[in-house]
Curated annotation (Swiss-Prot):
Disulfide bonds: none annotated. The keyword ATP-binding applies. One of its GO terms (molecular function) is ATP binding. It holds the Pfam family tRNA-synt_1c_C. Its EC number is 6.1.1.17. Catalyzes the attachment of glutamate to tRNA(Glu) in a two-step reaction: glutamate is first activated by ATP to form Glu-AMP and then transferred to the acceptor end of tRNA(Glu). The keyword Cytoplasm applies. This is Glutamate--tRNA ligase. InterPro entries: Gln/Glu-tRNA_Ligase (IPR050132), Glu-tRNA-synth_arc/euk (IPR004526), Glu/Gln-tRNA-synth (IPR000924), Glu/Gln-tRNA-synth_Ib_cat-dom (IPR020058), Glu/Gln-tRNA-synth_Ib_codon-bd (IPR020059), Rbsml_bL25/Gln-tRNA_synth_N (IPR020056), Ribosomal_bL25/Gln-tRNA_synth (IPR011035), Rossmann-like_a/b/a_fold (IPR014729). It comes from the Archaea. Signal peptide: none annotated. NCBIfam families: gltX_arch, PRK04156.1. GO terms for biological process: amide biosynthetic process; glutamyl-tRNA aminoacylation.
Length: 571
């Protein structure tokens, strides 16, 4: 065969791609493999391709990387884009397959049976960020059609909205599945009429036995008219709880039992917590059915979901096939394990809160967004933390320290510094006259000025700072003076003439302190509460992030007269 000009251009573009990728003249063997793999029509003339490739490589070798990239951009710009994708790090957001700017529609679909957790925040952040990148539409859909096992919490709807606001995200549309039962019922009727769904009266264990044996239940071949009659009776309340189930007809001999005639609707004579719904319905759609319908109705183009939901996609595909719909492009990601929290679920956390083990959903020991917000974690830190995980099938095991590191970059430049002494002991400075210590509000931002701390001859210090010292030990009271211990009981010191430089050379301790008339401070954190005394001025920082020197960053949560409550963020 004779190679056409188009064939020559194909060889040239792959040779150029190889050159641009590696920054040197292309490797003929690698290019040959690429050409033959991508262009089966050229396999009939390997010698002709090889000869053409030799000439092309020879010409390319005369150029430079800039010229190679310019030529590749001219004849095959898509290969430049492909190289850009491959050069991206494994972390971060990769381009969405088939995504078009302005046409991407994505959703985050939580069950509002509790507030957003760190685990669910991944979906909140990544989906909304993708929509932002592609200038698309972002939908918050509450999958709230389980009145029993994962019963919705009324407060959780607003909590999710509030958390999205905190993240700087305003959903383009908010949907509550519990408002859309008529839509689900309409599609159920259509499937029954098509002979693709049937009402099953088997007991759960009986159906499972038949399903596991790849045998149809006695109701599978009931004609559509009779199934419609049973369906209407289900809706009318003529059957009892779990007496009848509407099933989607799939392949009863499918190799995966989870895909065999799965349940789409069940009867549960329970009220919904939303007063607008209440006792309005007794036939409840299961998540796979409602989700399938919603993703079509709302025009979803892309879905990102956990790899544990791969079977959900396979089940839903039957509905899409029956109606002739195109399933959204779907990406699955692995589980996230956060070292400090291990395995947790919203239902177990809820029970622990109800039992009094935790003070509420914003208890600093919990892995909820409400809790980390209260502790002073910033939205931008969480967003970067989640985006850096990337989107892949591999399970992610990560420490909160990574989140803290991102947050530290944000709060360190803005947090005023204060002294806070925990487990305080009184220290007397012999011969000290009343003095006003001037201490920087921030170590590098000098424009903020100084904080003035008035003391007489006594201060409070942390007991642990004194524990291993002896009479004669020299240390420095930070931003005040160098002292030498003269007595351990009672604790007394005298001014020392030792210079700061000599103290540092001798590796003497530099400790913080507060006046004896400081204010009571309680710090609530993941490891429990710590009480102590803080310097005055902390009470003016309500809702701000501050740094308690030598302790950590904290958010001032409450000020009640002379008492301050702070929430620990991190070191």
């Amino acid at each position: 065969m004779t190679l056409s000009p188009e064939d020559i251009k194909i060889i040239e573009k792959y040779a150029l791609q190889n050159a641009v990728k590696y920054g040197k003249a292309p490797q003929p063997k690698a290019v040959m493999g690429k050409v033959m793999g991508e262009c089966p029509q050229l396999r009939a003339d390997p010698s002709g391709v090889s000869a053409a490739l030799e000439n092309i490589v020879s010409e390319i070798a005369k150029g430079n990387p800039e010229a190679w990239e310019a030529r590749l951009s001219e004849i095959a710009p898509e290969l430049i884009e492909a190289l850009s994708v491959k050069k991206e790090p494994d972390k971060g957001l990769k381009p969405l397959e088939g995504a078009e700017t302005g046409k991407v529609v994505m959703r985050f679909a939580p069950n509002p049976n509790g507030p957003a957790t760190l685990g669910s925040s991944r979906g909140m952040v990544v989906n909304s960020e993708y929509v932002k990148v592609y200038k698309g539409k972002f939908i918050l859909r509450f999958d709230d059609t389980d009145p029993d096992i994962k019963r919705p919490m009324l407060e959780a709807y607003d909590w999710y909205m509030d958390d999205f606001k905190w993240l700087g995200v305003v959903p383009d549309q908010v949907v509550r599945a519990s408002d859309r039962f008529p839509i689900y019922y309409d599609y159920a009727r259509k499937l029954i009429e098509m002979g693709k769904a049937y009402v099953c009266f088997c007991k759960g264990e009986d159906f499972k036995r038949l399903k596991d044996s790849k045998k149809a239940c006695p109701h599978r071949d009931t004609d559509p008219e009779e199934n419609l009659m049973h369906w209407e009776k289900m809706l009318a309340g003529e059957y009892e709880d779990q007496q009848a189930v509407l099933r989607i007809k799939t392949d009863i001999e499918h190799k995966d039992p989870a895909l065999r005639d799965w349940g789409a609707f069940r009867i549960r004579k329970m009220s919904h917590p939303r007063p607008e719904i209440g006792n309005k319905y007794i036939v409840w759609p299961l998540l796979d059915f409602a989700g399938a319908i919603e993703d079509h109705e709302l025009g979803m183009t892309h879905i990102i979901r956990g790899k544990d939901l791969i079977d959900s996609e396979k089940r839903q595909t039957y509905i899409y096939k029956y109606f002739g719909w195109t399933y959204p492009k779907t990406t699955h990601w692995g589980r996230v394990k956060i070292h400090e929290f291990g395995k947790f679920s919203t239902s177990t956390l809820r029970k622990a809160i109800e039992s009094g083990e935790y003070s509420g959903w914003d208890d600093p020991r919990l892995p909820t967004i409400r809790a980390i917000r209260r502790r002073g974690i910033r939205a931008e830190a969480l967003k970067k933390f989640m985006i850096e995980m990337g989107v892949g099938m591999t399970d992610v095991s990560i420490s909160m320290e990574s989140l803290y590191a991102e947050n530290r970059k944000i709060v360190d430049p803005v947090a005023n510094r204060y002294f806070f002494v925990w487990n305080p002991v009184e220290l007397e400075i012999e011969g000290m006259k009343p003095v006003v210590a001037k201490v920087p509000r921030h170590p590098t931002d000098h424009a903020r000025g100084m904080r003035e701390i008035s003391i007489e001859n006594k201060v409070l210090v942390c007991a642990e700072d004194i524990e291993k010292l002896n009479v004669g030990s020299v240390l420095r009271l930070k931003d005040l003076c160098n002292v030498e211990i003269t007595s351990l009981s009672p604790l007394r010191v005298k001014r020392s003439e030792t210079s700061l430089e000599d103290l540092k050379k001798a590796k003497g301790k530099i400790i913080h302190w507060v006046p004896v008339d400081g204010i009571p401070v309680k710090v609530c954190g993941p490891e429990g509460d710590i009480e102590g005394t803080g310097e005055r001025g902390i009470e003016t920082e309500l809702d701000n992030i501050v740094q308690f020197e030598r302790f950590g960053f904290c958010r001032i949560d409450a000020v009640d007269g002379e008492n301050v409550v702070a929430y620990f963020a991190h070191k």
